[in-house]
Amino acid sequence: MRVNIEEKSYDGKRKILKNIKLDIPKHQTTLIIGTSGAGKSTLIKCLIRQTKFKGTIIDEGYDHKAMLEKIAYISQHPTLNKNETVEESIYWTARLNFLRQSKANLLEKTKKCINDAGLNYVCKQPVKALSGGQMQRVAIAKELIRDKEILIADEIDTGLDCGVARSLCNMLNHIAHKEKKTVIVISHNLINIELYDNVVVLVKDSNKTGRIAYHGSPYQMKTFFQVHDYVYILMKLNSEDEGGENLADFYIDQYERSI
């Protein structure tokens, strides 16, 4: 997916995003993190065409409008029928999306998605009996069964403990690498950052506009930002150097010079 958002503003005045240029690799996981107010949610809205912007988003020759047919989106608070069992919830999603397929085929798809999402041990339980992490797995499975090529997950690890969030990351990696999906994740959680193939860091420049300060491997981030731990990256991008310069501006310039 090639993203080129020249500018996103509201009322033609306040710029929210500027110069967002990304090549998001196929069949890999890409994590998008950022400082508060840097435009992560707005970027997602651009990707799923919920807001207008100046620029283009294309994928393998498909324009943005046509590309929407290839995208599955999972929100932080997915809508689930909590009275259904896990198996029923996923099966009926398949039934609604593949009307001409036989029941046997749909049940086979359901079984595979339950397995891929790590839900075998709770498949007969009602959704309302699940934990928050398990409900997110059901939401992912319901999108996975629709067989879209691109999966976008928005803050799905919010409120989950570290172990559960890590297991979700591992599942998303399985979906990307084994099921050949392109997975994009928005998160504020830096603990599992090394599990992703690629990381994008959004920051606010001195004009309060969201820009890219980094895009690359998580293993090169510490060197790029000159920190010994990932947790210090966003703290550093919210500070100034000894001369009073906005460090976010410095790293935006460093990144844009490198591309």
List each model region and its residues:
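Catalytic Walker B motif of ABC-type/P-loop ATPase nucleotide-binding domains
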Residues: L151-D154
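Hydrophobic anchor residue at the start of the ABC signature
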Residues: I140, L168
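Topological signature of polytopic alpha-helical transporters
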Residues: M1-E6, Y10-K13, T35, L202, ...
